[in-house]
Amino acid sequence: MLRDLQETDVKAIYDINQEALGYSFSPEDTASQLARLSKDSHHFLLAYEDEASHALLGYVHAEVYESLYSKAGFNILGLAVSPQVQGQGIGKSLLQGLEQEAKRRGYGFIRLNSADHRLGAHAFYEKV
């Protein structure tokens, strides 16, 4: 089930960031960033929650991308799914939710950058 990220998700976000992305950003710093970014309309934070357990299984974080050469769109800053549930359509659902929000806002595109060494991520993005 898709929903907004919440302050109660901090531990799960920290775990997913560490396990899926290899980032070791402290839970305290994660909580601080989540609180700040949640209030900023230029950031969109969407969660995927297991309907039975209510556990956070993944999230997408996008920011508004604006320039002098195009209309506004979204720039994906992070898309992460717990490794234990990857391959079950969660990442695709998160991207579809982001696409719906982009359409609702009248945005014309969604973009992202992915590091060269993240070959699994590249294959996923090409597939969706």
Where are these regions (language model features)?
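Short, cationic motifs built from Arg/Lys/His that form the positively charged side of catalytic pockets
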Residues: 1-6, 86, 118
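Acetyl-CoA-dependent GNAT
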Residues: 4-72, 77, 95-96
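Conserved functional loop/turn residues at catalytic and ligand-binding sites
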Residues: 9, 78-80, 85, 89, ...
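Short coil/turn motifs at secondary-structure junctions
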Residues: 64-67, 81-84, 117-119
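Conserved hydrophobic beta-strand within the GNAT/NAT acetyltransferase core sheet
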Residues: 76-79, 110-114
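Conserved acetyl-CoA-binding loop-helix of GNAT-fold acetyltransferases
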Residues: 81, 87-100, 123-127
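Conserved active-site alpha-helix within GNAT-family acetyltransferase domains
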Residues: 92, 104, 108, 116-128
